[in-house]
From Swiss-Prot:
The active site is at Y50 (proton donor). Belongs to the aldo/keto reductase family. NADPH binds at L190, I228, K230, S231, V232, R236, S239, N240. One of its GO terms (molecular function) is aldo-keto reductase (NADPH) activity. This is Aldo-keto reductase Mkms_1985. It is an enzyme of class 1 (oxidoreductase). Keywords: NADP, Oxidoreductase. Pfam families: Aldo_ket_red.
Length: 276
């Protein structure tokens, strides 16, 4: 069974479960992406900053699948923001990936200190008009960044990919996304592994005969989130995709949601201005 599709505000759709390759070493990436595609994944999420676009693209090319069957996402790094720099960075990314278009291109971080994300998004819009990108979105944007972006460009991003897990469920931001028609995508959906041994999570998982990771992925799905768990282990990659044959109860959902404590595992987008 394939992943359900989430409709985007531009008329396109994205598979709800994909493989993320953040912190996947280049030497492991090709094998991980190949395992994911063999297991049925049709959505792969990389970024220029990950250093593994080339290996991601090679795995897709060698999979036997048509390019149109794989939803491919990459991200523009902070040092490449700005209109002209973005156009050049895009060409470099698709060259490394070995493709001629992207399904989704994201601004990796707002980098508020540089104040270039509006010009960057205007370049994204041009690339979309030119048929090089199907959907354009952002990552790690807070409400204030989204408002400036939309007010300045008149374009609502299709997706905002944010740190999101039971410890940091991002309720207010998800509510804003719903109001604006932005799809919510979760990075570090398993809390970087910190939740996999939590008795609340393992209890819910065991009641369904599932793993803790599967229960967490299902929690995201039932909230409506797009989710991109990361693994280099072929068995775990396959297991993380085996999440379409069960459903968490309202009590299960509430139990996992009760773990919220506001813990942020990654940088704060309001102050993260790193461009190295």
């Amino acid at each position: 069974m394939g992943a359900p599709l989430v409709a985007l505000n531009d008329g396109n759709s994205i598979p709800q479960v994909g493989l993320g390759v953040w912190q996947t070493p280049p030497e492991d990436t090709e094998r991980a992406v190949a395992a994911a595609l063999a297991a049925g994944y049709r959505h792969v999420d990389t970024a220029a900053a990950y250093g593994n676009e080339e290996q991601t693209g090679r795995a897709i090319a060698q999979s036997g699948l048509d390019r149109s069957q794989v939803y491919l996402v990459t991200k523009l790094w902070n040092s490449e923001q700005g209109y002209d720099a973005t156009l050049a960075a895009f060409e470099a990314s698709v060259d490394r990936l070995g493709v001629d278009y992207l399904d989704l291109y994201l601004i990796h971080w707002p980098v508020p200190e540089k104040n270039l994300f509006v010009d960057t998004f205007k370049a994204f819009a041009r690339l979309r008009e030119d048929g090089r990108i199907r959907s354009i979105g952002v990552s790690n944007f807070e409400p204030e960044h989204l408002r400036v972006l939309i007010d300045s460009t008149g374009i609502v991003p299709a997706v905002n990919q944010i740190e999101l897990h039971p410890l940091l469920p991002q309720r207010e931001l998800r509510e804003l996304h719903a109001q604006l028609g932005i799809a919510t995508e979760a990075w570090s959906p398993l809390g970087q592994g910190s939740l996999l041994a939590h008795p609340t999570v393992t209890g819910v998982a065991e009641s369904h005969g599932k793993t803790a990771a599967q229960a967490l992925i299902r929690w995201h799905m039932q909230l409506g989130n797009i989710v991109i768990p990361k693994s280099v282990n072929p068995q775990r990659i396959e297991s993380n995709f085996d999440v379409f044959d069960f459903e968490l109860s309202e009590q299960d959902m509430a139990s996992i949601s009760s773990l919220e404590d506001g813990s942020r595992l990654g940088p704060d987008p309001k102050t993260f201005n790193f461009t190295g």
